[in-house]
């Protein structure tokens, strides 16, 4: 962990607010593009194993079939959110085409074969 980040964590840990912070509920939405091994955006339809993009509360699409949104249920802990995201992400990876990967961002970036 970076020194500045550690200092910030220490600085803002105010015991007066601990009960309030514990009552927070949180969720994560993570976008990823399905990308083929050649670095181009996948043109294949939304994988059936991921359920309907319109009704699955955890895996949906954004502006295109290839842009997945992974959505965690609400959790009271950061660890709970991250574990749910990990579970959804792993399930998604197991159920997309073999030659597809999940691009880490929603910005499309075709890659050349030399990359």
Question: What are the roles of these predicted feature ranges?
Answer:
Residues 1-115:
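Terminal catalytic/cofactor-binding subdomain
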